[in-house]
From Swiss-Prot:
Comp. bias regions, Basic and acidic residues: 1-20
Protein family: Belongs to the NRAMP family.
Gene Ontology BP, a term: iron ion transmembrane transport
Keyword vocabulary terms for this entry: Cell membrane, Ion transport, Membrane, Symport, Transmembrane, Transmembrane helix, Transport
GO molecular-function terms, A-Z: cadmium ion transmembrane transporter activity; manganese ion transmembrane transporter activity; metal ion binding; symporter activity
This protein's encoding gene: mntH
A Pfam family: Nramp
Region annotation (Disordered) ranges: 1-28
Membrane-spanning intervals of the chain: 50-70, 82-102, 125-145, 157-177, 186-206, 229-249, 281-301, 321-341, 376-396, 399-419, 443-463
Organism: Lactiplantibacillus plantarum (strain ATCC BAA-793 / NCIMB 8826 / WCFS1) (Lactobacillus plantarum)
Protein name: Divalent metal cation transporter MntH
Taxonomic classification: Bacteria, Bacillati, Bacillota, Bacilli, Lactobacillales
Record's bilayer topology term: Multi-pass membrane protein
InterPro entries per the UniProt record, alphabetical: NRAMP_fam
HAMAP family to which the protein is assigned, alphabetical: NRAMP
Length: 464
């Protein structure tokens, strides 16, 4: 009798564990918006493209967040237009990887975090979650610092107050989610447009040398032979592909309603999502190019430190640095673009945090609590630094530089599973990587890992 009860108890416990595991594994990525956007049937090419337009903008934000600004402008101020070719190469790599991430999400109905967790042990899943959570924290550091400094430059808020204000952004995101995912896409696209037009205007009035600028997109051997130039080039490449964007792309590609039993419909979704992604990443490419061109046109050959946001803000208003075009308007527009970049990145960073938390550890909690937890995890180190250094911008921006190391460490843990999963015919069926795509992806992955290891070793002083 006792034995029978024990067996029954064991069966019930096993069934309960199975149910819990199944619930976590089978839950949809970003469940509240998954499949929430309707796509018109048998519509024209342009109408269909409009329906699929949006997720690419959220992904593209990560390629022009405040963390990339200093590197791009420094590249132009030190080596004029020569590193434009590196930005072009980085953008092509981003297009390849983001297309793979979107295809993975559409075909499998699961995001990269969910698939990685399902195909690893519990211990490995927790380890990967910690690594990826650090990457999210590192990404958010740049967004919070950028927004906080922009608020100080525009409104005179103490930096600590600006950081606290950015923490409250999560409440705005909760409201936007209730209005629908298309509203979030529209707001992010608007912020991206602000960044684009601000720097387009500033580049136009800076009057760059067009022939010399176009020549910069052709790779030169000088990038490899010049050690300091190579280091900056590696910084541009290494900071371009960020791990959270691969998780984000694999999730938000599922916001459109797709019948996965219909292979033609899946193929259409993959096609239009990829087009949207490539268009938006082209915008990010233009923005990063404009940043470098601005650095080259205004700051090449000038003396002084331009390695911080405040330095750049002041320089744009100083006629001794940028000449007759210097004005408070240029400085103000720079701060507005910085705030737009920080705010748009905040939205995507918070979404990425939710995707990773749900996918890796299958943690289910009220939406407001989950987003607030994600935000607090990211803002804590920045706020601690700000309080410890009494709001000193220079010290706090050093934290931004340190955060890039975490991104470098986390990158392989996102890229390798992505290439493996999208090359797995049992998982992807007819949508598996073509041979040339697979080998290109592996070569790019290995090169980026080597470059990032090199950057890490240089950062910690093991390589000079």
């Amino acid at each position: 009798m006792k034995s029978a009860k024990t067996k029954d108890h064991a069966k019930m416990k096993a069934a309960e564990e199975k149910a819990i595991h199944s619930t976590g594994a089978d839950s949809k990525s970003l469940d509240e918006v998954n499949g929430s956007v309707r796509v018109p049937k048998d519509a024209s090419f342009w109408r269909t493209l409009i329906a699929y337009t949006g997720p690419g903008a959220l992904v593209a934000v990560g390629y022009m967040d405040p963390g990339n600004w200093i590197t791009s402008i420094a590249g132009g101020s030190q080596y004029k237009y020569a590193l434009l070719s590196v930005i072009l190469l980085s953008s092509l790599i981003a297009m390849l990887l983001q297309a793979m991430a979107a295809r993975l999400g559409i075909v499998t109905g699961k995001d990269l975090a969910q698939l990685t967790r399902e195909r690893t042990s519990k211990g490995m899943g927790i380890f990967l979650w910690i690594i990826t959570e650090l990457a999210i924290m590192a990404t958010d550091v740049a967004e919070i610092i950028g927004s906080g400094i922009a608020l100080k430059l525009l409104f005179g808020f103490p930096l600590i107050v600006g950081i606290l204000i950015t923490t409250a952004d999560v409440l705005i995101l909760l409201l936007l989610m209730k209005l629908g995912f298309r509203k979030i896409e529209a707001i992010v696209a608007t912020l991206v447009a602000v960044i684009l037009f601000v720097f387009l205007y500033e580049v136009i009035i800076s009057q760059p040398n067009i022939p010399e600028m176009l020549k910069g997109y052709v790779p030169t051997s000088r990038i490899v032979s010049n050690r300091s130039m190579l280091f900056l080039a590696l910084g541009i490449v290494g900071a371009t592909v960020m791990p959270h964007n691969l998780y984000l792309g694999s999730s938000i590609s599922q916001t459109r309603q797709v019948d996965r039993s219909d292979e033609k419909e899946v193929a259409k979704a993959v096609k239009f999502t990829t087009i949207d992604s490539n268009i938006q990443l082209s915008v990010a490419f233009v923005v990063n190019s404009l940043l470098l061109i601005l650095g080259a046109a205004l700051f090449f050959g000038t003396k002084g430190d331009l390695g911080r946001f405040v330095d750049l803000y002041n320089a744009l208003g100083d006629s001794k640095v940028v000449g007759s075009i210097a004005s408070p308007l240029l400085s103000m527009l720079f701060a507005i673009a910085l705030l737009s970049s920080g705010q748009s990145s905040t939205i995507t960073g918070t979404l990425s945090g939710q995707i990773i938390m749900e996918g890796f550890i299958r943690l289910k909690m009220p939406l407001w609590a989950q987003r607030l937890l994600t935000r607090l995890i990211s803002v804590t180190p920045v706020l601690a630094f700000a309080i410890y250094y009494h709001g000193n911008e220079a010290k706090i921006e050093d934290l931004l530089t340190m955060s890039q190391v975490f991104l470098s460490i986390a990158l392989p843990f996102a890229m390798i599973p992505l290439v493996m999963f999208t090359s797995n015919r049992a998982l992807m069926g007819n949508f598996t990587n073509r041979v040339w795509v697979k080998w290109t992806a592996w070569i790019v992955t290995v090169i980026l890992i080597i470059l990032n290891i090199y950057l890490i070793l240089q950062t910690v002083g093991l390589v000079k």
